[in-house]
Amino acid sequence: PAISLVGPVEIDEFYVSAGKKGRERDRESRSRALSKRGRGTYEGDKPPVFTLVDRGTGQRYVVPAKSADEATVRLLLDNREKESLTVYTDGFRAYDPLDDDESFHRESVIHGDGEYVDGDAHVNTCESHASLARRWLSPHRGVSKDKLTAYLRPFQLRRRIFRKPGREALKQIVREVL
C-alpha cells in the first residue's frame, strides 16, 4: 500500500535477521555470537525495517529498506499532505538532518539517556508495532531479505483489519488484494 501521511508521524527502525534463504551460500554459516558492533545492514543479512505511525489517521506502515540513512528517511516521509510535518523520532543519527529542514518539525527522545517520553514526543507505538512484526516473522524460521516485503504485507493487512467487524474486514481485504 502507498504511504500517505497526514501527521504527526512517529518513525523508528528495527533490524531483522534475513539472509539468503533458499539459495546457495557464498560463505560459511555465521556464528551465534555477536561478531560485529553497530547496526545491521542489508549486505550483512540484517536489513533495516522502518515503522511509521501516522497519529493523524492511525495508519501504520512497515517498510523494509536497503539502508538506514538520511535518503531513505526522506523518501519515506516524502508522501505527506501538509507542507510542514511533525515527526517524532529517537536519537538515531539518520534523523538528525530533519532538524535543519523547514519541511519537518522534529521532536526526539534519546533512549541512550534514559528518555522515552517527552510530552507528545515518543516512538512507543512504533516500537510496539515492531515487536508485533518480529513475532509475525519468527514462525517462518528464516526469511529471505529479498522477499521481506512479501512477508510483511500480510502482517500489515492483518493489523489493518484487526478488530473490524466481519463485512468491513472483508471489504478491506478485497480492496487490498485487488
Model-found features: residue ranges?
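Residue-level recognition of single "structural anchor" positions
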Residues: 1-178
